[in-house]
């Protein structure tokens, strides 16, 4: 049986990236909460 996690950086950014989060109201809420919590990394695409 195939495993569920098949790594793919492009898909990762498209689904969980900063621009993907900014597209929706809820995504922006996620970013706001992570800022309030003081997360070291906001999204997977902000690793640079």
From Swiss-Prot:
Keywords per UniProt: Ribonucleoprotein, Ribosomal protein
Keyword Ribonucleoprotein belongs to the record: yes
Gene3D superfamilies, alphabetized: 1.10.287.3980
A GO molecular function held by the record: structural constituent of ribosome
Entry GO terms, CC: ribonucleoprotein complex; ribosome
Pfam families in alphabetical order: Ribosomal_L34
InterPro entries assigned to the protein according to its UniProt record, in alphabetical order: Ribosomal_bL34, Ribosomal_bL34_CS
GO process terms (BP): translation
Family membership: Belongs to the bacterial ribosomal protein bL34 family.
Stored NCBIfam families: rpmH_bact
HAMAP family to which the protein is assigned, alphabetical: Ribosomal_bL34
Protein name: Large ribosomal subunit protein bL34
Organism: Ureaplasma parvum serovar 3 (strain ATCC 700970)
Lineage, highest ranks first: Bacteria, Bacillati, Mycoplasmatota, Mycoplasmoidales, Mycoplasmoidaceae
